[in-house]
A protein has these predicted regions:
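Juxta-kinase regulatory segment immediately upstream of eukaryotic protein kinase catalytic domains
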Residues: 1-24
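ATP-binding glycine-rich loop module of kinase domains
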Residues: 17-70
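Active-site beta-strand termini and strand-to-loop segments that position acidic
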Residues: 35-40, 93-94, 141
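Short C-lobe core helix of eukaryotic-like protein kinase catalytic domains
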Residues: 114-124
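Short, glycine/acidic-enriched loop or turn micro-motifs at the edges of active sites
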Residues: 96, 134, 153
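Catalytic-loop of the protein kinase fold
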Residues: 124-141
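C-lobe/activation-segment region of protein kinase-like
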Residues: 141-171
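Conserved structural core of kinase catalytic domains
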Residues: 58-64, 68-114
Length: 171
């Protein structure tokens, strides 16, 4: 996967998709989300949008999201992160499934037990999602497993005396 995201053709695909408004999965106030599905690779590419200070702040959010994904590498129930292209496009695994609010599944108790494990796993890695009230950030995968997506509002635990950060992870 690293070889794909380091290829100039992939960066060109991203820039062409943005210029032509193709392969767009979603657009939010933060940025554009592209869907790349070729040669067995099913990926999401997140980009920051805006100009000047607004773009800078949104790019910083994207970098914080990248840091959160790095900490959660290998956690079941969190999409794999493949890195940054040119330091500005975040590439993550595309998750096939249904948003929690629209999903139906056979064993709710087992699903919620698994969901709680996912939450505990990324909290143990020093990551708090920040927006689980949005049920679109909680997915039920095609094989009925929980998956938490979109860590754009995540908090990452920092070491040292950072009273707000420490307080967030104590509560």
């Amino acid at each position: 996967m690293k070889s794909l995201i380091n290829r100039p053709e992939f960066r060109q695909w991203i820039e062409n998709s943005l210029d032509r408004q193709e392969n767009v999965l979603a657009v939010s106030n933060q940025g554009t989300i592209l869907h790349y599905n070729r040669d067995g690779q099913d990926l999401i590419v997140k980009t920051a949008m805006g100009r000047g200070l607004v773009r800078l702040l949104r790019h910083r959010t994207l970098l914080r999201e990248y840091e959160a994904y790095q900490r959660m590498e290998g956690v079941q129930g969190v999409p794999a992160c493949y890195g940054l292209v040119d330091g500005r496009y975040l590439v993550i695994e595309y998750i096939r499934g249904t948003p929690y609010r629209d999903a139906e599944w056979s064993d709710r108790d087992a699903w919620f037990d698994s969901f709680l494990r996912v939450l505990r796993d990324f909290h143990q890695r020093g990551v708090s999602h920040g927006d689980l009230k949005s049920k679109t950030n909680i997915m039920v995968t095609e094989d009925e497993r929980p998956c938490v997506i979109d860590f754009g509002t995540a908090f990452v635990r920092k070491s040292g005396w950072r009273w707000i950060n420490n307080w967030l992870f104590e509560h």
